[in-house]
Amino acid sequence: MSWLLFLAHRVALAALPCRRGSRGFGMFYAVRRGRKTGVFLTWNECRAQVDRFPAARFKKFATEDEAWAFVRKSASPEVSEGHENQHGQESEAKASKRLREPLDGDGHESAEPYAKHMKPSVEPAPPVSRDTFSYMGDFVVVYTDGCCSSNGRRRPRAGIGVYWGPGHPLNVGIRLPGRQTNQRAEIHAACKAIEQAKTQNINKLVLYTDSMFTINGITNWVQGWKKNGWKTSAGKEVINKEDFVALERLTQGMDIQWMHVPGHSGFIGNEEADRLAREGAKQSED
């Protein structure tokens, strides 16, 4: 009887796919930098380690040996780094719930045209290695934030921050031109990130922001405002019309996943974007 059990066990093992070779039913997901490092068998397990983790590094491999080699920093250079291919699970969806439009559009700012103050970026940015970006699936991850001291009071100072990862050459904190308000800063931080992405030929972007006003404005309210002649449901002029016009124009040709992250809640990317924005607010206006 013991011999039969041994034989049955050997047969069962032979029927299993070899984990050190090519798996017939999936791939191996290697995480070099994330919450936990190692090799995982599903994209969901991998994503749990790299989602919202700054400068995460991960790859998908056909064999376990290659996956572990990557974890040990000796992976084959032929495999592209940092993203899931078209057969993998899709990255996070856009904000699942769209809030209702506020009755007054934006109650914290006074209406004033802004377009004349804002200058589009015209300086071409040097190409940056794709390995320096963080990825969620095949989407590049970026964090944006805006700030304004004395918002709505005398002598406000606003800045925008864009954070791509630790020490990334595209990280930027600059003073917001024109009308100094917090919500304008939030919108134009997103504008800056998209401008930068386009200079790097990046057309898939996961953009994290703590501004639900920006997210709901660009994903939902803008269409209603346009149909209503850029007026709110209460019949008032949309205060940030020119800002959202600029943002919507930049999103053309881009696949952007708008993601909300709670502000000042310990998310490193958000904290760094906030730091950059505050540094930008200290700069003088050009």
Swiss-Prot record:
Biased composition annotated in UniProt, kind: Basic and acidic residues: 101-115
The UniProt record lists the keyword ATP-binding: no
Record GO cellular component, one term: mitochondrial matrix
GO biological process: DNA replication, removal of RNA primer; RNA catabolic process
Binding site for Mg(2+) 1: D145, E186, D210
Protein family per UniProt: Belongs to the RNase H family.
Annotated protein name in UniProt: Ribonuclease H1
Organism: Homo sapiens
Organism taxonomic ancestry: Eukaryota, Metazoa, Chordata, Craniata, Vertebrata
Gene: RNASEH1
